[in-house]
Amino acid sequence: MGSNRGRKAGGGSQDFGAGLKYNSRLENMNGFEEGVEFLPANNAKKVEKRGPRRWVVLVAVLFSFLLLSLMAGLLVWHFHYRNVRVQKVFNGHLRITNEIFLDAYENSTSTEFISLASQVKEALKLLYNEVPVLGPYHKKSAVTAFSEGSVIAYYWSEFSIPPHLAEEVDRAMAVERVVTLPPRARALKSFVLTSVVAFPIDPRMLQRTQDNSCSFALHAHGAAVTRFTTPGFPNSPYPAHARCQWVLRGDADSVLSLTFRSFDVAPCDEHGSDLVTVYDSLSPMEPHAVVRLCGTFSPSYNLTFLSSQNVFLVTLITNTDRRHPGFEATFFQLPKMSSCGGFLSDTQGTFSSPYYPGHYPPNINCTWNIKVPNNRNVKVRFKLFYLVDPNVPVGSCTKDYVEINGEKYCGERSQFVVSSNSSKITVHFHSDHSYTDTGFLAEYLSYDSNDPCPGMFMCKTGRCIRKELRCDGWADCPDYSDERYCRCNATHQFTCKNQFCKPLFWVCDSVNDCGDGSDEEGCSCPAGSFKCSNGKCLPQSQKCNGKDNCGDGSDEASCDSVNVVSCTKYTYRCQNGLCLSKGNPECDGKTDCSDGSDEKNCDCGLRSFTKQARVVGGTNADEGEWPWQVSLHALGQGHLCGASLISPDWLVSAAHCFQDDKNFKYSDYTMWTAFLGLLDQSKRSASGVQELKLKRIITHPSFNDFTFDYDIALLELEKSVEYSTVVRPICLPDATHVFPAGKAIWVTGWGHTKEGGTGALILQKGEIRVINQTTCEDLMPQQITPRMMCVGFLSGGVDSCQGDSGGPLSSAEKDGRMFQAGVVSWGEGCAQRNKPGVYTRLPVVRDWIKEHTGV
């Protein structure tokens, strides 16, 4: 007992005095007390040291100290840093060409799997021993899976190496090898190994890779569809700080089609978001990653992926504690394509990337040889083109691409045409081992080389447009070639410095229509000046300086800086009565008011889905893309007007929708039904759609049914809505909110897709722009009031039509929130040139809305 206590005490507190060369304590030696006595000298001057000798001694002592320090440092380096090792882990795969795949290899606990895995590990060890920079530092390897072809082994290898050899090891492992290993041990038969490749991974992933607590293996059977989900889906969130994986297999000579039906994980951010990755392999190697996913996708988003062989690996790595349901996915097998491409010999036709509109598979090459009659030329028009790789700079076609006439095309491109000067053209499509996309949809056409666009104008891209669109001031060709080298009509056109022709009423409208700014030069205010809303010109330096230099406050509106200024109709007023110089400060994610009132009541304007589907031909909206859009149905008449949700109990619409006529009492709230969360008018009973009756209708008391001034109405719902992924409110702007000319805004509704056409079944969307108020008044004199705003394209083509009345104008503001800029009111015709749509301006009636709804 005493001995143990002595060792314990010694371990915690040592007698450091025993280790000192000199000790101030007196020691008992041989039983006697010893000391040191200094005797006085007979002649002090003789024994006194001379000055110069002292310096020699000091230098010697200093030199000795430095030498000892250097030796100590070298010893520390030798015994500590020289022995430091860096952990390197590599994921890889190899092919065993003289083996046949057995079904038992799918089960990692089977005798056959264990036996073959042991031999592969021994083969890897022998292989590394052949490389001087690898063999001495190889710690261990492990086989994680096998798949067909003859037999592909997936493995990881761990090395412990000196830091100065790290790069050499990386280079050695990056070499793809083809080797034959003779039997050097009893347990190792002769292996012919090809395609021995490996890629570095984060060593921290090794522990997660070895954890099988959230690992699943699934095999497709026949044509059946197999479903799998994250743990707990959809009733509880997936586990935090975990790694889950799904090994998906199909039969030999098949490929897999994988679709995520529902996808909701933590948002993508820079803080290490949760991540789902799909690999065209059974090893999580970056060069074989097909896609990485995070965030929330709408159900209609294209999340279908094809493998190049009969396996997929899906991993979920969670780094956050945020609670999300995860995903639901399905997969099935289909026969592997024996060839891709082909010979096309009709006068016209279509072709696409493999499995379009699903993502094309990795590692594929397709060639289409197109031949039309000898007396005709051929051109290819790509109607849709998505070949985007997240790791490739725009314009660099080094991975996935389409090649025609020696030129490569990649990325995301709008419709374009490639022509041949003969009756033949060859289109080649290539995808590498990683990251795939939707691909392309194309058509080929034959044409007369002497007249490629009969009776029409041909853009340099090969597109044909009507001749009257040439030099009309609007770019109808994607490359603007229809507006170049024009002679402008001085009566109604302005000649830009870049030789473009623009309508005269676009001059000095505060929008750079020419592109070079020449249509805004020489206007009422000189260069370097600011034009106040009252027409006064000020030096640019006086804008946003905290002083009302204009006299109407407009020089202090829309400022990035935040200053407390005198209150005007242009300044934002906080709840405490103070006014800010900053423009549109409400709900922008930054607290500007000292009382925080600018960031209150901001549960609005955000979509539940962070990822929306691409517009693939047409203007159909996506599910949940406009969750504040409402469809109003009149009894026995179906959809008549639109509306927007601004709170659980209130809608905003247009007053003219509720004016009685001799046949129907539209002002009677009992005649109306509101559908929220609706996308397709033919599926009003679909899951997520809420059908509600109205409680009352409030039209603006100043509404004029002749001029449509003050065209706005408030609708109270009979009961509160339930917010969901497809039902959310839009933000209402402050009375001082500014939607400047040129700003992009979205119009939505089920109205007619063209003038005189029928209503759409699927919710439609169109991007339009705010038009300068002066220009608007010039286009429609004596018709526009301060409560109205013009929005659209003066070139026509996109507009709201009958049936969209009462629907919202949605404007994306700071922080990504959507604010309602206006209400669809009226217009002359539908999508006509110089006839933009007219909308009720929301900020002007904001106080009236708040008075009646409290919103």
Swiss-Prot record:
GO terms for cellular component: basolateral plasma membrane; external side of plasma membrane; extracellular space; plasma membrane. Residues 86-203 form the SEA domain. The keyword DNA damage does not apply. GO terms for biological process: cell migration; epithelial cell morphogenesis involved in placental branching; keratinocyte differentiation; neural tube closure; protein catabolic process; proteolysis. Glycans are attached at N107, N302, N365, N421, N489, N772. Its EC number is 3.4.21.109. Residues 214-331, 340-444 form the CUB domain. Keywords: Disulfide bond, Glycoprotein, Hydrolase, Membrane, Phosphoprotein, Protease, Repeat, Serine protease, Signal-anchor, Transmembrane, Transmembrane helix. The keyword Phosphoprotein applies. It comes from the Eukaryota. Residues 451-488, 489-522, 523-561, 565-604 form the LDL-receptor class A domain. Gene3D superfamilies: Low-density Lipoprotein Receptor (4.10.400.10), SEA domain (3.30.70.960), Spermadhesin, CUB domain (2.60.120.290), Trypsin-like serine proteases (2.40.10.10). CDD domains: CUB (cd00041), LDLa (cd00112), Tryp_SPc (cd00190). Disulfide bonds join C214-C244, C340-C366, C397-C410, C453-C464, C459-C477, C471-C486, C488-C501, C496-C514, C508-C523, C525-C537, C532-C550, C544-C559, C567-C579, C574-C593, C587-C602, C641-C657, C776-C790, C801-C830. The chain crosses the membrane at residues 56-76. Exhibits trypsin-like activity as defined by cleavage of synthetic substrates with Arg or Lys as the P1 site. Involved in the terminal differentiation of keratinocytes through prostasin (PRSS8) activation and filaggrin (FLG) processing. Proteolytically cleaves and therefore activates TMPRSS13. This is Suppressor of tumorigenicity 14 protein homolog.
